Amino acid sequence: MELLLLSNSTLPGKAWLEHALPLVAEQLHGRRSAVFLPFAGVTQTWDDYTAKTAAVLAPLGVSVTGIHSVADPVAAIADAEVVIVGGGNTFQLLKESRERGLLAPIVAAVKRGALYIGWSAGANLACPTIRTTNDMPIVDPQGFDALGLFPLQINPHFTNALPEGHKGETREQRIRELLVVAPELTVIGLPEGNWIQVSKGQATLGGPNTTYVFNAGEEAVPLEAGHRF
């Protein structure tokens, strides 16, 4: 399988998805036809989100079609060479994808050779479940099971920073709480600017920041770019 799972879409001082474009180009391998799932977009229309994504990827020769705009989305996914899943609200993304019957077709397409690209919520959707999302508002997606294309849980936008005087939990504390109730999970705290590329059965970590892996009852393990899972 070919996956590109990004923690986020925008870095300080860079345009939207600018840091991801070289990675996308590297993994395209001649693929040009893409479908885009805009369902995580809550404060922007799905048409606008699709147009924005299409404009960014056009210089790479990728043609993007919004899956919400086609008469037969299952057939469109089956025919696509690239499946792109945008960030935003993970609950809304999973709810819409499940209700439209798109989860199994996406898995089948990627297993047949389509490239999967997802950032933030789109990276969450590639995991076994969405239980490591950070998102609000919460809508009911009728279950948290997701695509399961990547075997570990990703926590996008990972940071342990807290504003001075803030008394809420750190991100690590929240992940630790999850591992108490679900000790079978392994969670990757993926900071902004980092990504995971899967190619030819090998998953490789990229990006400038330290990533952390969390397992129940164990110390967090720091990982740097180039680590292979």
From Swiss-Prot:
Recorded superkingdom: Bacteria
One Gene Ontology term from the biological process aspect of the record: proteolysis
NCBIfam families listed in its UniProt record: PRK05282.1
Name of the protein in question: Peptidase E
Function of the molecule: Hydrolyzes dipeptides containing N-terminal aspartate residues. May play a role in allowing the cell to use peptide aspartate to spare carbon otherwise required for the synthesis of the aspartate family of amino acids.
Reaction equation(s) it catalyzes: Dipeptidase E catalyzes the hydrolysis of dipeptides Asp-|-Xaa. It does not act on peptides with N-terminal Glu, Asn or Gln, nor does it cleave isoaspartyl peptides
GO molecular function, one term: serine-type peptidase activity
Family affiliation: Belongs to the peptidase S51 family.
Keywords: Cytoplasm, Dipeptidase, Hydrolase, Protease, Serine protease
Any one cellular-component term (Gene Ontology): cytoplasm
